[in-house]
Amino acid sequence: MLSPKRTRFRKQHRGRMKGISYRGNRICFGKYALQALEPAWITSRQIEAGRRAMTRNVRRGGKIWVRIFPDKPVTVRPTETRMGSGKGSPEYWVAVVKPGRILYEMGGVAENIARKAISIAASKMPIRTQFIISG
């Protein structure tokens, strides 16, 4: 699972996801990519599940790049706890994804193989996505 080695602060505000992604919205490394169409928090488990699904499908053929990193801690309070007494403890990590952001890239394989592998990874994501080709 992906997570930062160390952060400056243990806890963060939730924030809000306005607008579209201006950074990380172009294909940089591979030829094919999976692009987000909706805003969401994507957990490190979901990122890893998508990466594993793609790797298993492509076998040794191509190369895969994960273009998002979960750097936001999400805190959860223990169950049946009364209100107050501070914020909960960090439970898992999420990547904040806005529409237009590239999630995964792939290269070194035929288009039909890439399309199949990326569609399997897309089914692991909690948002609508699209398959795009560079060029």
Curated annotation (Swiss-Prot):
The keyword Protease appears for this protein: no
Cellular component terms (Gene Ontology): chloroplast; mitochondrial large ribosomal subunit
InterPro entries in UniProt: Ribosomal_uL16, Ribosomal_uL16_bact-type, Ribosomal_uL16_CS, Ribosomal_uL16_dom, Ribosomal_uL16_sf
Family stated for the protein in its record: Belongs to the universal ribosomal protein uL16 family.
GO BP term (any one): mitochondrial translation
Localization per Swiss-Prot or TrEMBL: Plastid, Chloroplast
Chief location: plastid
Name of the protein described by the UniProt record: Large ribosomal subunit protein uL16c
GO molecular function: rRNA binding; structural constituent of ribosome
CDD domains (UniProt xref): Ribosomal_L16_L10e (cd01433)
Organism: Eucalyptus globulus subsp. globulus (Tasmanian blue gum)
